[in-house]
Amino acid sequence: SLMQKKYTDFKLGVPDYVTVETEDERLVCQGGQLIVTAGATTVEFQDAGEHEDIFVTSEDAVRCVKLRWNYKIPKSARFLGDAWERTYGDVEWHGMSGNRYLPWYFLAKLSEKVLCFGVKVRPSAMCCWQADTKGITLFLDVRCGNTGVQLKGRKLRAAQIVCMEAEGADTFETAQEFCKKMCTDPIFPEFPVYGSNNWYYAYGDSSEEEIL
């Protein structure tokens, strides 16, 4: 008999290690608590119900915050990641590779279930994940251009983490469901929208008649 589809949210909780990289230094701190202070930088974790908020505040120029969880995923799992901008037909399920960057979110397919890890849309950082045999890592790149962000004591909500486990659903259905959790306010027009990718719009001779 077909297993009933079951989607369950879960929380990663506070990370086991927090690394803060500023313009001047790189500090690795023990995690396991809601507030971690590294030099003049504070990283704060809040359970916000359906997601977990990560806040960063600092008097230093912060380049990146790295969060590490000792959350082990079996080496036999298959992984599907996203792309920074858009996919170019190169997204695929692949084996575990600890040095592969997985932008925004990823799915891990185990024998009986699929695990999903991601951040909600519109974060205040460029976010990517890594997964290896000993745990998973989330990178929060908060640079302004190529230099550390000058928060000057302001509190930045860098990202909102969401996690989901799926049983009895295929991977495509699971990805659809997880994308709904990452974007809870999509804008869907009531009519089809067609577009074209015209690299020459700025200096070419384009017209409505020519394109259509």
Predicted regions, residues:
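Carbohydrate-recognition beta-sandwich/jelly-roll modules
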Residues: 1-212
